[in-house]
Amino acid sequence: MAISYQLKSPAFRGLGRRKSSVARVILLKGSGKFTINKREAKEYLKSDIYIKDALQPFDLTQTNNTFDIRVTVRGGGLAGQAGAIRLGIARALLEISADYRSVLKEAKMLTRNTKVKERKKPGLRKARKARQFSKR
């Protein structure tokens, strides 16, 4: 699905959130260089699974290696941060071309995953786990 587009500005921004992570993504015309918090993505995310997850919007829109990605991400763990980066990239791609919306929406890349860890309640071991109850 090769969509032709005219770049309106040099940088395209997107904000993504997942669990307690917030990612600010900037896409620049380039060769596919991926940096997270001024470090190389492989060095930061460590696992190829997280990197593949974060770059999924590029696979769907067939725009691999056409943009340099600069990300500032805070909070949460690596899985949450990868999910936040994925949403940020998808939103930044929409700024480039609105034609990507149908492809990204169909793959649920534009939907914020609102699931957040439930808090621990007093008197319980975890959020819902209680001690074993004996009736007699």
UniProtKB/Swiss-Prot annotation:
GO biological process, one term: translation
Keywords assigned by UniProt, alphabetized: Ribonucleoprotein, Ribosomal protein
The keyword Ribosomal protein belongs to this UniProt entry's keyword annotation: yes
Region annotation Disordered: where it falls in the sequence: 115-136
GO molecular function: RNA binding; structural constituent of ribosome
Any GO CC annotation of this UniProt entry: cytosolic small ribosomal subunit
PROSITE patterns: RIBOSOMAL_S9
Ranges of compositional bias, category Basic residues: 117-136
Family designation: Belongs to the universal ribosomal protein uS9 family.
Name assigned to this protein: Small ribosomal subunit protein uS9
Organism of derivation: Mycoplasmopsis pulmonis (strain UAB CTIP) (Mycoplasma pulmonis)
Record gene name: rpsI
